[in-house]
Amino acid sequence: MEDKKIGIPLEGFGEAVRKAAAEGMVLLKNENQMLPITEKDQVALFGRCQMNYYKSGTGSGGAVNTAYTTNLIDGFRRYKNIVLNEELLKVYEAWIQEHPFDDGQGAWASEPWFQKEMPVSLELAKKARETSNKALVVIGRTAGEDKDYAAVEGSYYLTKEEKQLLETVAEVFEDTCVIMNVSNIID
């Protein structure tokens, strides 16, 4: 086989992929018209998967080579009118330096379903609320070949840490949105 494009992202598919992604998103609720985010909003991002974005699953689904991936932060920064809470982002960046992404050491289907989440104190959430009017909490999951979802915490169910994160943020922010960064089908 002489096809030299095997293993190389084919040009021209980016727009089709963006369209498929937009059409594949599901909005479950939009209470009080929290969405869309506008230039009037100042956004606090919570959850490590705002940075450590899941782009693929496990097993063969994890063997995805891309020219680049765009995490939530970089996606928001493309829109100059949306203000992110940079102080909170710095806290997450420092924590992630000390708690790097667990890729399962690259072994087949060994990446965990979820990543350890940064504890968010009520004080940190309140500090973020001083300069932000909306909160987005990103929860990440991966699964796939040789590592299907299971009815356990950290896979199909939220972990105790994720529940605590959601409770803390929702206590402080009236407008809180949960974004599920999942690498495949989940309900």
What annotation goes with each model-predicted range?
Residues 1-187:
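C-terminal non-catalytic regions of proteins with extracellular/luminal or membrane-system context
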